[in-house]
Amino acid sequence: MNSKYEINTKENREFLKASCENLLNFGHRFPSPNGGSYYLGDDGTPWKDRNRETWITCRMAHVYSLGLMLGHEGSGELVDAALKGLRGELHDDKNGGWYAGVTQEGGIVPNKQCYAHAFVILAASSALTAGRPGAKELLEEAVDVYDQHFWNEEEGLACDTWNTEFTVLDDYRGLNANMHTVEAFLAAGDVTGDKKYHIRAGRIIDHVIRWAEDNSWRIPEHFTKEWVADLDCNRDRPDDPFKPYGATPGHGIEWARLITQWALANCREV
């Protein structure tokens, strides 16, 4: 085996460091003038004819918060640009929370997604860990909105999608948003020291492990509002980007990582 692929060899550490730097260099041109993230082409060129989405902007805030802590040049300014977008064009000043995104002309992409709001918590948590101005206030608002509209304390799970005004809740329930909620709650618990976030993450994980066990260890992705697995969801549209038909192997890998992270943080066996 090539030594650069052998864990913790000198060549492996150098390879990982170089790969990390290449990825961080690639994304430097993501911010639009108002802070929302552009999609990027293969060479890092901004695609200005596409929507600027909240979840991508949050991911960029998270990534460059890590970059800042790794000493990557320019990361602080990029985090601040993404936070500007989350406080500005992506924020719904009238109804609260965050739009799914904005169009290239600045119009609103409708609906309020748990998926996007979980990412706002992650972005703010990471930015706060990295010491960026305004991150604490953003995190406080993000968890307040999330608690009010998405988290169900009785169920120990999060709902999925509201209309833009937060007046009509869709019947669909899904694990993709809950997976990223676990990611966000782990980050929020780490930076605030509030144990309730790790407890909530553990409650979601308990559900997921049980559902996986009941389904031959293939994790169901889609559910009814009563949290009954809907194994036929999108059978006719198997390539839906956010609600694909069937189990998603990559999500199984991500759940394994999140469950391990939660267990290590809480000194638990699973």
Language-model features: locations:
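Glycan-recognition and catalytic cores of secretory/periplasmic carbohydrate-active enzymes
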Residues: M1-V270
